[in-house]
């Protein structure tokens, strides 16, 4: 399994959520609404989830193995960093 595409949109909020991403797996399957979160131990990726009637959040889709989770997280965070550097370059060029 390979993450073949990452689409990312940074969000400017005061909260811990920093971006929302969509990934394509093996050019065949897309997962939307993956969140990039600034956690207590650094940035991490939260899979799409929905709130249950009792108020808990349950993942809609998630990797089964830690290896797959690491691949997804690495791909999304790499794109997050790339987009951030691109935005900084644009701001510096316009200043």
Swiss-Prot record:
It holds the Pfam family SpoVG. Gene3D superfamilies: Stage V sporulation protein G (3.30.1120.40). SUPFAM superfamilies: SpoVG-like. Keywords: Cell cycle, Cell division, Septation. GO terms for biological process: division septum assembly; sporulation resulting in formation of a cellular spore. It comes from the Bacteria. Belongs to the SpoVG family. HAMAP family: SpoVG. Could be involved in septation. This is Putative septation protein SpoVG.
């Amino acid at each position: 399994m390979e993450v073949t595409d990452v689409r990312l949109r940074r969000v400017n909020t005061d909260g811990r959520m920093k971006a929302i991403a969509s990934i394509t797996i093996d050019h065949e399957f897309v997962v939307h609404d993956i969140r990039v979160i600034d956690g207590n131990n650094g940035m991490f990726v939260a899979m799409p989830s929905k709130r249950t009637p009792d108020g808990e959040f349950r993942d809609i889709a998630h990797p089964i193995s830690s290896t797959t989770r690491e691949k997804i997280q690495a791909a999304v965070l790499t794109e997050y960093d790339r987009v951030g550097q691109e935005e900084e370059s644009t701001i510096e060029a316009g200043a």
